[in-house]
Each structure stands twice: as structure tokens, then as C-alpha cells.
């Protein structure tokens, strides 16, 4: 599973499941199996169930089971957008990393931490961790798919930094790797990210073309990390004045997204329906309360800047100044959080 070969993991799981009756005879082995089963479900795109019923592991002495418990809970919380919980389990897994001797597992830890920081719009920290991961995967045979995953993450971190030439280089390299390894789903993920890459450059039509293709091929239900793609599809259609299409993707998005993106979709829907500025302000302030709780300072920066511009256009310089300052504060907090430790 660490090498991210989904089909190979599926075959291996079938072999292990055939001996499940024996596994259940020993509590520690069954606990280990259950943790890996949870990890497999996430690898397969199933995030419906959290790791419940295994809280007792937290009270045990330090062990690899305790590490896996916190590490897998960290992955789950990151993917479903519960960043406060993710931070809690990340810190505890990091404390236990010292007892993990397998360098592949340490590399996997840094890869997952890189994704976490990417989701929090902290690209410098993301790049720092993904390079630690890539150092191992590049030097060892059998991790080609993982190398592709790391390059995909590097590409998206570069998008966040506005380094689009370098971002394209990483994303295309990742796509080539996945295609050579016949990994269709990861390759589709890169195509989806290419849509985000074009959207960040205000190339709406190109973004829509890539994202629409990925949206159709991914099918239902949508995985948590695809929430942004659906949102960006709606947003780019809105920017082009395609309100019917924008509404369609808003409705699709709210069916299977995290709480974080419920706020994004709700605000976008208000803009599509041309709600009053007062109503839009109310929705943004509700969202900001949530974003502050989870330290999503980039979102706070963007929305308060938009509110500032709208209030300035409406002739209310007092409110415009208030929101410009909030945007400035969020930008500084984001910069502070993103510094290398």
C-alpha cells in the first residue's frame, strides 16, 4: 500500500482476507489487520467510516500499532477536511516516528505531511516534506508510483507559489509515470490537477475542459480530495457567465463534500444568484468563523479581499478598509504558519 499500487494492494488483500478466521484468533494481529483494512479503504477512495472502536490503542505503551493508529487517523482527518483533528494525530504520530525503523514508512509519513500542508496552503512546508519523501522513493526500486505521487504534490505546491512553469514540469512528469505504470486512477488525479493548474492562471476554458473530463471519469461517489475540482468547475463556469452549468456543479458538489467546501459552495451559489452584498457578507462571515477554527488563512485572505473590493465599489470605504485589513492579517498569519521550523 505504501508504494501506492492500488491493484496489487487489492489482490494482496484478498489473500489476507482468506485467512481472516486465523487472524481473529490473536487480538494484536487482528488489531493490526483492522488498521491496515482502514488504510486500504482510504487508498480505495472509501472515506465513509472513521477508525472507530480502536481508541483503546491510545492508552497502550508506545508501539507500532499506536503509531499506525495516529498516522491513519491523521490521513483520514486530512482528507475529510478536519484539520484540527489532523493536527492532533499528526503531532502524536510524529512523536512515535522514532520507533519506526522502516525507511519506507518514514518516507510515507513525510509524503502525507506534505499533502496536509498543501491543503492548508502552506507550500513551502509541503515541498520540504515531500522532498524528504522523494529522497527515499527515488533511490529505491519498486516505488515508481510513489515517485509520481510526490511529483504530483510538488506540482500543486508550485501552483500555490505561482511557479507555473515548474508546476507543469512536475505534473507532466507525474502523469507520464502513472501512465507507464498503468495506474489509471492516479493518472486521472493528475489530469484533474492540471485543471486546477489552468484555473489558477485564469485560463477558464482550458480548466473546464480538463476538469469536466476528470469529473465524468471519476464517477460517483466523489472522493473527498475531488471536492475542490467540482468547486473550481462551478467557479470557472460562473466567471464565464455560464450560470446554468455553474449551478449544476454547485448542486453536484454539495452532495459529497466536506464541511469546509459546503461554505465555498454556499458563497458561490449566492454569487450566482446575485444575492445582496449584505447577504454575501453574512455568508462569508459564517465561513470565516469555520476557517479560523481550522487555520485556513488563505481562504480568509481571499474572501475578505473580495468583500473589501465589493464594499469599495459600493461606496462604503469604512467597510472596505475593515476587510482589506482582515485580508492583510490573514496573509501575515499564513506566512507565519508556513515558515520552516
What are these regions (language model features)?
Residues 14-21, 52-59, 91-102, 131-142, ...:
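Amphipathic alpha-helical segments of tetratricopeptide repeats
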Residues 25-30, 61-70, 101-108, 141-149, ...:
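Alpha-solenoid helical repeat architecture
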Residues 219-222, 233-297, 305-315, 320-321:
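Helix-coil-helix junctions within alpha-helical repeat/solenoid scaffolds
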